């Protein structure tokens, strides 16, 4: 099968760090056929500088009218996602959209309904499902090394005492740290544990740099109630803009062990430094950041447990190419669905909305199905 003719909408960091490198790394699967670049001229174009043969459009309607384009990758600010995704679907294009998907649950639901009615793929770029640290924690939980998990704490922290001034810092729908990083951490949580019963959150401007209504710090707790054969579970997802030094990534506690991991997945920094996803060292974590495990054997006297065995766990190599391979498989097989299911995207939207309500009201918000 010929490579899927792909158009990329957007010329910012996300397009050139999180999308173009993987399209380039998979030439048998995708062709970078077109780009939407509003300020391009006949002599100056960011997309053409990276891909000399790319067809550059300055008008979106003209790009969407190109019948050769099969897949549209949307790498634009979230406040325009609803409009642009709608246009692409109505033009008969399959769509891969950056996260955060839309500012509201209602808009997200409308778009998935539209894609279904037109028998088109619509998926959201939750690439951090393929972070090495997450894959390592996921495997550790699923193989039972920790027993039953009762607390799962996940962080992505930064030390940034200023606002960068991009879409994430402007008081528009879909802005702020919860939509930016929280959408990833919540997606990872529901991938592991499903739908929580309720949400308790605190969102704030930690740095007190205007606009103060755009949060730069959050702590969101997803509550899972005890059920028959299952203990209660709290999933805590956090991010801070004032965190200096080696940052904690995961603390996971279970009935048979604990998992502690420092350091963030290296892929973003590697891509920023110009490393190709084809490089043998791509996605490989530093041994200094390997997780520490404390585990107990399966059959113990709970009244007199032995001292836990401490060990170091090598990080599974992360690889965002896997998401693009899923996209290719979905289009080739005509299933039009990746592992990021529509109901999961909608659940993330619902949890984010509940987190804002919880923080504003200082109460827990039940999460109805």
Swiss-Prot record:
Enzyme class, first EC level, given as a word: oxidoreductase
GO BP, sorted A to Z: NADH regeneration; negative regulation of transcription by RNA polymerase II
InterPro entries attached to this UniProt entry: Gfo/Idh/MocA-like_OxRdtase_C (IPR004104), Gfo/Idh/MocA-like_OxRdtase_N (IPR000683), Gfo/Idh/MocA_oxidoreduct (IPR051317), NAD(P)-bd_dom_sf (IPR036291)
Protein's UniProt keywords contain Kinase: no
Gene3D superfamilies tied to this protein: Dihydrodipicolinate Reductase, domain 2, NAD(P)-binding Rossmann-like Domain
Disulfide pattern: none
Keywords: Oxidoreductase
Pfam families, A to Z: GFO_IDH_MocA, GFO_IDH_MocA_C
GO CC annotations on file: nucleus
Entry's Gene Ontology molecular function annotations: kinase inhibitor activity; nucleotide binding; oxidoreductase activity, acting on NAD(P)H
Record keyword Lyase present: no
UniProt-listed Enzyme Commission number(s): 1.-.-.-
Family (UniProt): Belongs to the Gfo/Idh/MocA family.
Name of this protein: Uncharacterized oxidoreductase C26H5.09c
Organism expressing this protein natively: Schizosaccharomyces pombe (strain 972 / ATCC 24843) (Fission yeast)
């Amino acid at each position: 099968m010929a490579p899927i003719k792909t158009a990329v909408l957007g010329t910012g960091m996300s397009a050139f760090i999180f999308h173009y490198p993987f399209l380039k790394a998979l030439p048998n699967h995708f062709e970078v056929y077109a780009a939407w670049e509003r300020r391009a001229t006949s002599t100056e174009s960011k997309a053409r500088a990276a891909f000399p043969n790319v067809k550059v459009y300055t008008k979106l309607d003209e790009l969407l009218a190109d019948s050769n384009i099969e897949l549209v990758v949307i790498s634009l600010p979230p406040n325009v996602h609803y409009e642009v995704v709608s246009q692409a679907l109505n033009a008969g294009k399959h769509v891969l959209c950056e996260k955060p998907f839309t500012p509201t649950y209602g808009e997200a639901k409308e778009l998935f309904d539209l894609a279904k009615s037109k028998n088109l793929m619509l998926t959201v770029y939750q690439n951090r499902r393929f972070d090495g640290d997450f894959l390592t924690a996921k495997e550790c939980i699923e193989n039972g090394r920790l027993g039953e998990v009762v607390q799962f704490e996940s962080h992505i922290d930064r030390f940034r005492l200023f606002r960068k001034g991009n879409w994430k810092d402007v008081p528009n729908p879909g802005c702020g740290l919860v939509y930016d990083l929280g959408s990833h951490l919540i997606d990872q949580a529901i991938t592991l544990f499903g739908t929580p019963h309720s949400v308790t959150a605190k969102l704030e401007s930690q740095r007190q740099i205007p606009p103060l209504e755009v949060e730069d710090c959050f702590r969101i707790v997803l509550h899972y109630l005890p059920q028959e054969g299952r203990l209660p579970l709290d999933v805590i997802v956090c991010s801070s803009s004032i965190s200096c030094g080696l940052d904690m990534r995961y603390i996971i506690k279970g009935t048979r062990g604990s998992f502690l991991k420092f350091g963030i997945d290296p892929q973003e920094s590697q891509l920023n430094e110009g490393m190709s996803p084809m490089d043998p060292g791509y996605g490989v974590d530093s041994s200094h950041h390997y997780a520490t495990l404390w585990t107990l054997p399966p059959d113990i006297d709970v009244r007199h447990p032995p001292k836990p065995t401490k060990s170091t766990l090598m990080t599974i190599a992360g690889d965002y190419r896997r998401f693009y391979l899923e996209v290719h498989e979905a289009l080739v097989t005509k299933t039009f669905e990746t592992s990021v299911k529509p109901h999961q995207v909608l659940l993330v939207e619902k949890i984010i909305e509940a987190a804002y309500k919880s923080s504003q009201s200082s109460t827990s918000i039940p999460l109805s199905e």
